[in-house]
Amino acid sequence: MRHKKQELKSSFLVTPYIKRLLMSHITGLSTAQLLAEPNLQLTEEQQIWMDNAICRLGNNEPLQHVLGYSEFYGHRFKCDGRALVPRPETEELVEWILNDWSTLNSQLSTLNLLDIGTGTGCIALSLAKELTNSTVTALDISEEALSLAKENAKLLEVENVDFIKGDILNKTFNSQLSTFNLIVSNPPYV
């Protein structure tokens, strides 16, 4: 009975759009190609993956964790249970910083930026990729999140980021805050 309940719950969660995303991921075909081939048959291995993905969605696992990635500011970030999923509206924060930096650029020779609670590294890495003359420090209290952010730095070929495990509330770290000319954070919703 619980299995049938789970199947029913999953069927409501998997909209045609989400199904196309899953199908595109597993087949490597674009959405347009999938629409052009409505009778596409999955291999047995692909069908097993698809069934597992739908089950995971039914268990309230985020789509980005099921797919293993999230798109953010034009880049693909590895995404899994080690950090929360980057929120689309956070891209506006990155855009705002980049726009303001172009104004401040004449006043400061280099940007020394701190990203507090870096998670996947989406803010720190997106800014570091755009502001190549900057020094970016990505801080997180979670070793697991930092390991994910480091993997994303490697995938995106970003080298101007230092990763630090630490607690911003720690007095020792607090004394170092004055070395940064920009501090950014987009903590999880409470």
Predicted regions and their residues:
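Intrinsic disorder/low-complexity segments
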Residues: 1, 98-112, 160, 172-181
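N-terminal auxiliary segments of SAM/dcSAM-dependent transferases
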Residues: 1-67
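Histidine kinase transmitter module recognition
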Residues: 11, 26, 82, 155-156
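A generic helix-loop boundary/linker signal
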Residues: 12-13, 40, 80, 113, ...
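Active-site/binding-pocket entry motifs
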Residues: 28-29, 83, 189-190
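SAM-dependent Rossmann-like transferase core, predominantly class I methyltransferases
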Residues: 52-105, 109-131, 136-151, 165
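S-adenosylmethionine
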Residues: 130-135, 139-190
